[in-house]
Structures are given as structure tokens and as C-alpha cells.
Swiss-Prot record:
This is Lymphatic vessel endothelial hyaluronic acid receptor 1. The chain crosses the membrane at residues 239-259. It is found in: Membrane. It comes from the Eukaryota. The keyword Metal-binding does not apply. N-glycosylated. O-glycosylated. Disulfide bonds join 61-128, 85-106. Keywords: Disulfide bond, Glycoprotein, Membrane, Receptor, Signal, Transmembrane, Transmembrane helix, Transport. Glycans are attached at residue 53. GO terms for biological process: cell adhesion; hyaluronan catabolic process; positive regulation of cellular extravasation; receptor-mediated endocytosis. Residues 279-322 are annotated as: Disordered. The gene is LYVE1. Residues 260-322 are cytoplasmic.
Amino acid sequence: MAKFFSLGLLLASIWTTRLLVQGSLRSEEISILGPCRIMGVTLVTKKTQPLLNFTEAQEACRLVGLTLASQDQVEEARKFGFETCSYGWVKNQFVVIPRIISNPKCGKSGVGVVIWRSSLSSRHRSYCHNSSDIWINSCLPEIITTDDPLFNTETATYTTKLMVSDSTHSELSTDGPDYVTTTVAPPLASTSTPRKRKLICITEAFMDTSAVATERESDIQNRPAFKNEAVGFGGVPTALLVLALLFFAAAAGLAVCYVKRYVKAFPFTNKNQQKEMIETKVVKEEKADDSNPNEESKKMNKTPEEPKSPPKTTVRCLEAEV
């Protein structure tokens, strides 16, 4: 019961004090020193003496639409140039003077927020704060910058996106979009169409000599590589296939020219020449040796000269896809 009685008495005293303060302070008596607020902080005083105690300082700030500032808020304002030469109440229940330059007449030559602890009934001015200020100086349109990690991250992200967009736009034409969408086309399926194969054979006749044998060996060695090249034409374009056919035609023409040039090497021509030579020789011997029939018969009985071994033929085949 005693606790409830003491609590009611306390509330009644506070209410009575508030009524007394409200009755003693009027908004016409309150004056704001300076038209501008720094970081929302300004100095409020009373036009007439005496000045304000701690309770009256709170009420004075309320009458001008502000709240009693704290020591930290006054320190923040001092960093941006807020400086006075008057002690004033703060929320921490002591009086302070914000100083930037040392002055023996202001705060005993102190620098910073000079603190003086005095009784709550002592008379001083008050430092009030406006929490809705977004400018460093309320008289200048300069936005307050804060060290917010989230704000810094968003700013960095925006800058990065802007740089990427600018570099992309510089690479594109003036009529193109601001963003590039890269699409990867699927690889085309390789379609293989059946091709006809044509076999070209060239027959060449040579006498059985060492030179011909050497050439035949070189042809045998080069033939597999040539066939491999022909087989590899399966996937080449039409232009390369046409070039290959022209190459084969040129080879055939060279072979024909070679045969015409060395036509004496054919066996049929050699046999005709051998017959003509034998007949001429027989006629000469008959005219010269009519008186000697025995010798003529011996000569006639002689076996004709054996012809050379029949020539060997080689076949050269070329396989190409058409």
C-alpha cells in the first residue's frame, strides 16, 4: 500500500512541476540563436532572465518543435563546424560547450565538447536537435552522407553495372540495344550423302628393262598413298572434288602423251621392223650368193633371231568419288 502511495505522489509531483513549467514558459519567451542548424543541432535560450534549468531546457526545446540534444549529437555537429561560446544543457544532464578553436573566454581554452557538471537547478541555455534534418547545414541544400555499409555496397554495385552497360554500348552500334544477349546456335548435324565412285585405269606397256622395273617399284610405293587421298574425299566440298577430277584428267593426258612419245617401245612396231629387216637381208644374200647355194641354204636354214621377251604391262588405277 505504501508503494502505491509513493508512486502516486511521484506522478502528482511530476504533473504539478510540468504544469508549473508550462505556466512559467511561453513560446514568445524562447529564442533560437542563429537561423541555421548544423547536423540538426542549434542553441536555444530565453529572452529574459533568468535562463533555463534542466527541466525548463527540455520544455523549451519542445516548444520550438525540437528535442533536447545529446552529447554525441553535439559532437557530430562540432565536426561540421558547429561552435559556440555558451554552456547549454544536453540530454546527459550536464552542460557542454562545443569548441573548435581554443579560446580562454570560452570553456577555459578547451577544444572539443567541453563538459561542465553542475546541479540540475543551475541556469543555462539548451542545445536542441531536429531529427528530421537531412542536410549538414539547414540553410544550404547539402545532403548528409553516412557511412552505411549497405549503402556503399549498393553504390558499388550500381557503378559496376553502369560501367558494364557503357562498355557494351560502345561496342554496339548506335541503333542497337543497351544489353547484349549472346545465343549459341546448336551445331549443324553433319549429313552424309552417298557418292558414286569412279575407277579410272591407265594401261602402260614397257619393255623389261631395269629402268622400267625401277619406275614400277616407285609406282607401287606411291599407289597406297594416292588411294588414301582418294578415299579421303568423302567429306570435302564440291570445289575440291572438281579439282581432284581435273588432276586425274591431267594425269590421264600426261599418260597418253607419254605413250605417244615413246611409241617405238610398243611390241607390235618392233615386230614389223624386225620382219622388214629380215626380208631385206634375205634378198641381199640371194643376190650376192647365187653361186653358192649351199651357203644360201645354210643361211636360210638358220633360225631367225629370237625376239625379245614380251613386254610387261602395268595397270594404274585411280579411284575417285563423284
